[in-house]
Amino acid sequence: DSGIEWIGQVPEHWEATKLKHVAAFSGGGTPSKENPDYWNGCIPWVSPKDMKHEVITDSIDHITTKGLENSATKLIDSGAVLLVARSGILRHTIPVGINNVPVSLNQDMKALSLDETRVRPRFILRWVQGLNRSLLGIWAKEGATVESLEHEYVANTRLPLPDLKEQDAILATLDLETARIDALISKSEQSITLLKERRAAFITAAVTGQIDLRGKQ
């Protein structure tokens, strides 16, 4: 047993640790909007609106080096796990991704820079995705006016952790299976789109006299 009620059974040889023991946490901030020298630079400034994909390659807004140096935000090296920490979207999901370029963050984001001698960033990505509903209940800040995650709850979450070799095997299996499922979803969506088009075309034909229904009366 993992000893963690909401996780349940895990292999006995997996290590039980806390997230804060394998990750360094960073927050973000917003450079002054009144200073144009801080904005429209080349440094991605990631906010919740950018968290629509697993891999974060860019952002809508960008800041300059001056903006970075004169605000609470900092440069996050590539390979960190990025979480939305404050947003209405936390009513139903925790958006999560990994940046493959250095980025800065706004104050509604958190970055987990991981000890890669112990854990793969993509393992944490999949862990958050797979346990999203449970983690939402555990991490939610009580009494907040806007949905947000409580840092202490996140940092102290217990994490069942296999060794790196097993993490790699798990990730490889997940990549294969999720790719297969995504392909099936895409095929199903294409079929649904085609059926909707046929339905609309049939209705159009029926109401414009293109279908002879006299023999069916």
Predicted features by range, described:
Residues 55-59:
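Cytochrome P450 core scaffold surrounding the K-helix E-X-X-R motif
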Residues 15-53, 67-71:
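Low-complexity, Lys/Gly-biased intrinsically disordered segments
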Residues 99, 145-150, 182, 192-193:
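Short helix-capping and inter-helix turn/linker motifs at the boundaries of alpha-helical repeat units
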Residues 47, 64-131, 150:
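A short beta-sheet element
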Residues 1-29, 156, 160, 164-168, ...:
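Non-catalytic DNA-recognition/assembly elements of restriction-modification systems
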Residues 1-12, 180-217:
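Short amphipathic coiled-coil heptad-repeat segments
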Residues 102-110, 141-168:
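A short glycine-rich beta-alpha junction/loop motif
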Residues 4, 32, 69-70, 143, ...:
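Short, solvent-exposed loop/turn positions at domain surfaces
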